[in-house]
Regions:
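An accessory alpha-helical subdomain
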Residues: 123-212, 225
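Conserved lysine of the Walker
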Residues: 36
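Short, flexible helix-adjacent loops and helix caps
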Residues: 51, 166-170, 294
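Short, flexible loop segments at the rims of nucleotide/cofactor-binding pockets, characterized by
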Residues: 94, 308-310
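Nucleotide-state sensing region of NTPase/ATPase domains
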Residues: 47-131, 137-143, 147, 201-206, ...
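Conserved NTPase motor "head" modules and their coupling/switch loops across ABC/AAA+ ATPases, GTPases
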Residues: 1-31, 45, 173-184, 188-303, ...
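H-loop (His-switch) motif in ABC-type P-loop NTPases
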Residues: 334-336
Length: 384
């Protein structure tokens, strides 16, 4: 799968852009704050129906403007597909595939698989369990629609149970139906997470070793209440209800799962250097790519946002070697250092294109495909 063309109007600092992409390597060069990451965020939005920054839709509309639109043209398994997004603050979001509006946006997740490697991935190591659960859920949801359905059902039931706890409800019958729903979905969620961690572990270790190549031993494991308690979630909820009534929320369940990250038998957050942490998160994302490629039976888009920061020259060289391989499909790379991008393009025999990014405008610098077409003309920012 690859994104052939992208049209953007009023997305963050991008007033107007019309870009035609290489099916392999696309590089974006520019200083910080110029719009490189915003371009990747637009591509991410078309796959996930939301920004990777966590901003609300209304905050994505360019300052001073009243709407935003995006249109992406894809080659998906040899079939032309088009996605369209329209946002008008205060109105319902429009998200169309092939001109048809989605009834449920959750039905879109996984249809256009994508893996993002970004500076915020540091939170996978240093952040809370919520960050690592989000990572698990995003990956598995793209490959298993039923998993996403169970996440939604569990989340709704969890909110209902928490409301009963806050209202100091004491009638056991009020909890029964809710907790039965939670248990059914929790069993599926936990099983899917366990299987995913087991499959990811070996792939992740191989990528880490290829980048680090210094004998470091990484490992990951799922930390789950249900894995440690075979009696099921309802038994756990019953045993903790008195405590939950006091604190006003549910203290056990998949919403409290975590991933333990280890390096040489020590927690990564305590023992690893910045370079080791960066290597760790990149290896996790590349393992995610392999997992999704096999599950979806197509190559996801790979977005690499400022990935070379905090890596020494040797690890940069090894990473460039990895992402230049044919196992990866279409790649979007941003950097402030032209040498990094030139090195990637020189190492790859594949088609490539590169742009200079300044204040939300994109100027084609180089293309292995020859002369630019109309889509590649620099887009001028409107004047007041």
């Amino acid at each position: 799968m690859h994104l052939k063309r992208l049209a953007i109007t009023n997305f963050k600092n991008i007033a107007d852009a019309r870009l035609r992409f290489s099916p392999k390597i696309n590089c974006f060069l520019g200083n910080n704050g110029m719009g490189k990451s915003n371009l990747l965020d637009a591509v991410h939005y078309l796959s996930f129906c939301k920004s990777f920054t966590g901003l609300a839709d209304a905050a994505l509309v360019k300052r001073g403007e009243e709407f935003l639109t995006m249109r992406g043209e894809y080659d998906r398994k040899g079939v032309d597909e088009e996605l369209q997004v329209g946002l008008l603050p205060g109105k319902r979001k429009s998200f169309k595939r092939g001109g048809k509006e989605y009834d449920r946006l959750s039905a879109h997740i996984g249809a256009f698989p994508l893996v993002l490697v970004a500076p915020a991935d540091q939170e996978l190591v240093s952040g809370t369990g919520e960050e690592r659960r989000r990572f698990m859920d995003q990956v598995i949801s793209q490959t298993d629609p039923l998993y996403l359905d169970h996440l939604i059902r569990y989340g709704r039931a969890l909110q209902q149970r928490n409301k009963l706890l806050r209202d100091h409800a004491v009638d056991p019958s009020l909890y029964l139906a809710i907790e039965m729903t939670m248990e059914r979905s929790a069993a599926y969620i936990t099983r899917a997470r366990q299987e995913w961690v087991e499959r990811l572990t070996g792939i992740f270790g191989r990528y880490y070793e290829r980048i680090a190549a210094d004998g470091e031993i990484p490992s990951i494991s799922l930390k789950s209440h249900l894995s440690e308690n075979p009696d099921g979630l309802m038994a756990l909820l019953d045993s903790t209800r008195r405590h939950d009534e006091i604190v006003g929320h549910t203290s056990v369940g998949p919403h409290r799962d975590d991933i333990d990250l280890w390096l040489n038998g020590m927690p990564v957050r305590r023992a690893a250097s910045q370079g080791q942490c960066k290597t760790y998160t990149i290896a996790l994302r590349l393992a995610q790519y392999d997992f999704m490629r096999e599950a979806a039976r197509m190559k996801p888009l790979l977005l690499l946002d400022d990935i070379f920061d905090k890596l020494d020259a040797t690890r940069v060289e090894r990473l460039v070697e990895i992402v230049s391989e044919d196992i990866f499909g279409q790649i979007f790379i941003t950097d402030t250092n032209r040498d990094h991008l030139d090195h990637i393009m020189s190492r790859s025999a594949n088609d490539h294109r590169s742009w200079m990014v300044e204040e939300g405008t994109f100027t084609l610098m180089a293309s292995s495909a020859g002369e630019p077409d109309a889509d590649d003309a620099p887009q001028q920012q409107p004047t007041a």
